[in-house]
């Protein structure tokens, strides 16, 4: 849905939900046909219950429950972030427990310890904005495309200097919590101070922002 949301510099929930409606069933059908599979092989259907955008979640849950009802199989409700946490276990060389995972998205930024038996400990989290949101908002300020992460990274590689030296909130704190709202505001002020936003400015701001965000 990148092309759909690019005009707005971020996800528009209503548009995302409508696009889910038009694409999800054909996508599922195509995947089964492409891999020569039958729906009868399914023993259950797992679906995300959230957290996330209400509209797209509703579409996914409606379709999952409809298919499950037709096949007379159970639906397994999955926590969105827990699913991300456990994805490494599907790798050919999965990590041994306990392991620590960094979850970064447009809505969440968490450092989580994963133990046996579905036990999780949040070691740190953002106290305000998610890192993905900060990247998207910065990209929008610089009139770049969506999603912001790849666009900023591409420009950052062209700069050799930390020209703007943006703040690193909480970097010296004793905890593992994070903060990105101040960084986002610092980028806004830097852009406002410039008479005009040149290509060189975009490159240097992207580099300075990315350096501060990942430090």
What are the language-model segments listed below?
Residues 44-46, 56, 99-103:
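Short glycine-aspartate micro-motif
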Residues 154-215:
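A contiguous, well-structured pocket-lining segment that forms one wall/lid of small-molecule binding clefts
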Residues 93, 116-160, 184-185, 189-194:
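Glycine-rich phosphate-binding loop plus the immediately following alpha-helix
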Residues 1-51, 80, 84:
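N-terminal beta-alpha supersecondary unit
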């Amino acid at each position: 849905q990148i092309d759909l949301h690019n005009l707005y510099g971020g996800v528009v929930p209503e548009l995302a939900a409508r696009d889910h409606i038009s694409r999800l069933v054909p996508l599922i059908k195509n995947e089964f046909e492409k891999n020569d599979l039958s729906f009868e092989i399914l023993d259950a259907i797992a679906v995300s219950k959230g957290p996330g955008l209400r509209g797209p979640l509703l579409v996914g849950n409606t379709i999952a429950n409809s298919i499950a009802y037709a096949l007379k199989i159970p639906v397994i409700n999955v926590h969105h972030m827990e699913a991300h946490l456990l994805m490494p276990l599907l790798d050919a060389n999965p990590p041994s427990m306990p392991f620590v995972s960094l979850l970064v998205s447009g809505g969440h930024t968490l450092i989580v310890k994963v133990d046996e038996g579905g036990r999780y400990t949040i070691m740190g989290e953002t106290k305000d904005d998610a890192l993905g949101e900060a990247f998207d908002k910065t990209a929008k300020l610089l009139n770049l495309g969506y999603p912001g992460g790849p666009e900023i990274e591409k420009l950052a590689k062209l700069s050799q200097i930390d020209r703007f030296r943006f703040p690193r909130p909480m970097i010296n704190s004793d905890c593992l919590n994070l903060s990105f709202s101040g960084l986002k505001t610092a980028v806004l002020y830097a852009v406002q101070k410039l008479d005009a936003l040149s290509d060189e400015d975009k490159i240097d701001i992207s580099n300075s922002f990315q350096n501060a965000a990942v430090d």
